[in-house]
A protein has these predicted regions:
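Gram-negative/organellar outer-membrane beta-barrel architecture
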Residues: 366, 371, 377, 383-531
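Patatin-like phospholipase
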Residues: 19-57, 65-373, 377-384, 388-389, ...
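Short, ordered beta-strand-loop transition motifs
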Residues: 5-8, 203-206, 389-395
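Sec-dependent N-terminal signal peptides
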Residues: 4-17
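Solvent-exposed, well-ordered amphipathic alpha-helical segments
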Residues: 15-17, 34-35, 52, 224, ...
Length: 531
């Protein structure tokens, strides 16, 4: 009965717009400068100007999608000012989700080079450079929480959102824009904002999709072709790349990857608001209040002109009620089935245990979040890309996980260079494998003037009801306290002022206080002083 009532209310609320003047809002990309769009939307709503369609690119896609799925300007500001949002674009993880139980003892490595011998040597491709500045670990997960319910509500058809929506991504292989009209809303927005080198691109229908601003940073053409509005309001917070500067890496990258965009709207077709920012960087999100107010004040100053072009009005209370009705129909985010791509059956069993204890047991987004960060706390899995697919039959979501396992082998390099006698070289070789349990072997050592060490470590993690870790360590260490002038010199070493340590240790680790680790161990050691 409640659903029938909501449908009747929705029909009554939406009916007056069927044959009225239609207004489309186009939002350009521009990084943090796109926060200006929120102020524009607020000013239009407060003055009863309708927004019937919305298209956007990059940051314009983020703001546009939030509005299209039923967020008010207040909702958007609250989200973009939150500590959660700061973690999303920085890639940082909350301390309570850092699972020390799965982490190894830190090593003095500067970097590691990963490789695998599973394929032929012809396909040998060591990996040691990141593909993006921002770690995607947060965005991969949060886009499920942010967009999955809206995708379920509109059944993957962006015309059925609270406001019909389009965004632009780029297919750099085929050198063309991708107009995102349907599918997973989170994927569409994520692709549209994936600025090369800054954010990692995502794969959609076997196409690697990048920031839409590469080919179309102001999609007025998509607005006209897809929605045919009577009038367009455009907000431009970006410009075409200027001549690159010798010491400005970002301007060089923009000139290499971004095509020229037409940022104009003919007077006969609509109203254009252009904002020029010289001192706002790509990630200046902390300036949201300032940028919001600039957009709001500019729109208010043009309101007489806007109202003269747009005769139709919409009641703000009516919009709020429509928004409440629309969002109340969002299916609750409850998961049941887990479908994993990129892992063998044994690995899938290991991964599933991190989320629920049985295949038919439901779990929440918080359970997903905890399991997600647990799995990524060790070195076994490099990336997990989750998607939520709604099942209307039982009103739960299937959790689809695209898993990328780390390469089995890693060479670890590190050390310390000093003008004193504390020079040190670190070198390690590790092997890891994931099946029903996770196992890792590490042989490493340090060579230096004072401290020399060789160590072997073997670790096995069991993903049981009470996760358990077993670790075996064998170590040989020498301290040489005799000081010489030559770096790394081993000649004429005296037989005094030296300490030798040898030990064998077996440790059992258990999770403690959610993200902490408790260890119990037994060992045997020998310490010998020579002086």
């Amino acid at each position: 009965m409640r659903k029938i009532l909501l449908v009747l209310i929705a029909i009554w609320l939406f009916m007056p717009t069927v044959c009225a003047q239609k207004v489309g809002l186009v939002l350009s990309g521009g990084g943090a400068k796109g926060l200006t769009h929120i102020g524009i939307i607020r000013a239009l709503e407060e003055n009863n100007i309708p927004i019937d369609y919305i298209t956007g690119t990059s940051m314009g896609a983020i703001i546009g999608s939030l509005y299209a799925m039923g967020y008010s300007p207040d909702d958007m500001e609250e989200l973009l000012k939150s500590e959660d949002f700061k973690r999303w674009y920085s890639g940082q993880i909350e301390e309570k989700y850092v699972y020390h139980f799965k982490k190894n003892v830190p090593t003095p490595e500067f970097f590691n080079i990963r490789f695998s011998f599973k394929d032929s040597l012809k396909n040998f491709k060591p990996q040691f450079l990141p593909t993006s500045v921002v770690n995607p670990i947060q965005m991969n997960l949060v886009f499920v929480d942010l967009y999955a319910r809206a995708t379920a509500s509109c059944k993957g058809d962006f015309d059925k959102l609270f406001v019909p929506f389009r965004c632009i991504a780029s297919d750099v292989y085929n050198k063309k824009q991708l107009v995102m009209r349907n599918g997973d809303l989170g994927d569409a927005v994520r692709a549209s904002m994936s600025f090369p080198f800054m954010f990692k691109p995502i794969e959609i229908d076997n196409v690697l999709a990048y920031d839409g601003g590469i080919y179309n940073n102001f999609p007025t053409d998509v607005m006209r072709d897809d929605f045919h509005p009577d009038i367009i309001i455009g907000s431009v917070v970006s410009t075409n790349p200027t001549k690159p500067k010798e010491n400005d890496l970002m301007s060089q990258i923009e000139n290499m990857v971004m095509q020229k965009t037409d940022y104009s709207i003919p007077d006969s077709m609509g109203i254009l608001m252009t904002f020029k920012y010289d001192n706002v960087s790509l990630m200046d999100f902390q300036r949201i209040d300032e940028l919001h107010d600039i957009g709001y004040n500019r729109t208010i100053s043009m309101m007489d002109s806007i109202k003269s072009r747009i005769q139709r009005r919409v009641n703000l209370d009516n919009i709020r009620l429509r928004r409440m009705v629309y969002r109340s129909n969002y299916p609750e985010l409850r998961f049941k089935n887990i479908i994993i791509d990129g892992a063998n059956p044994q690995q899938q069993a290991y991964i599933k245990k991190e989320f629920h204890s049985s295949d038919n047991k439901e779990f929440t987004y918080e359970n997903l979040k905890e399991g997600y960060f647990r799995l990524l706390s060790d070195n076994m899995i490099s990336e997990i890309i989750p998607h939520a697919v709604y099942n209307p039959e039982d009103e739960t979501y299937d959790l689809h996980l695209k898993v990328k396992l780390e390469n089995n082998f890693a060479v670890r390099l590190g050390g310390n260079i000093s003008t004193s006698n504390s020079n040190q070289i670190y070198l390690g070789l590790s092997y890891q494998d994931l099946n029903y349990y996770a196992k890792e072997f590490l042989f490493d050592g340090q060579l230096g003037k004072v401290y020399n060490n060789a160590q072997f470590m073997a670790k096995i993690d069991f993903s049981t009801a009470i996760p358990t870790s077993y670790r075996f360590i064998a170590s040989i260490t020498t301290f040489d306290y005799f000081k010489k002038d030559k770096l790394f010199s081993r000649n004429d070493k005296p037989a005094f002022n030296q300490k030798d340590e040898r030990f064998l240790k077996l440790q059992v680790g258990l999770p403690f206080l959610l993200s902490k680790r408790a260890e119990f161990g037994i060992g045997i050691a020998r310490i010998e002083d020579k002086y």
